[in-house]
Amino acid sequence: MNNLTLEKKAQTRNLRKTLQGIVIRTSPKTIMVEVETAYKHKLYAKRFKKRKKFNTHDEKNLAEVGDFVKIAECRPISKTKHFRLVEVLQKKGEI
């Protein structure tokens, strides 16, 4: 492959979805992260909060319940895991 195709692949890899949320459950090498998004109704302009839970791969078991983390989309690791832990942004006790 030439350098141009490698650069294009790297660019598409960087376009993967990244989310931030709170860890609500842990188990070996897996965490469940709850991500909250806010949106506005198109017609009535009322604001809503939507919560979604993602099973996330945590290879080194770095995250604990209550931590604020950053996760990124990746290849399917199992039937329900399609995200991986990028970093722990804030520990539970820190402000």
Swiss-Prot record:
One of its GO terms (cellular component) is cytosolic small ribosomal subunit. InterPro entries: NA-bd_OB-fold, Ribosomal_uS17, Ribosomal_uS17_bact/chlr, Ribosomal_uS17_CS. One of its GO terms (biological process) is translation. Pfam families: Ribosomal_S17 (PF00366). Signal peptide: none annotated. One of its GO terms (molecular function) is structural constituent of ribosome. The keyword tRNA processing does not apply. Keywords: Ribonucleoprotein, Ribosomal protein, RNA-binding, rRNA-binding. One of the primary rRNA binding proteins, it binds specifically to the 5'-end of 16S ribosomal RNA. Belongs to the universal ribosomal protein uS17 family. Part of the 30S ribosomal subunit. This is Small ribosomal subunit protein uS17. The gene is rpsQ.
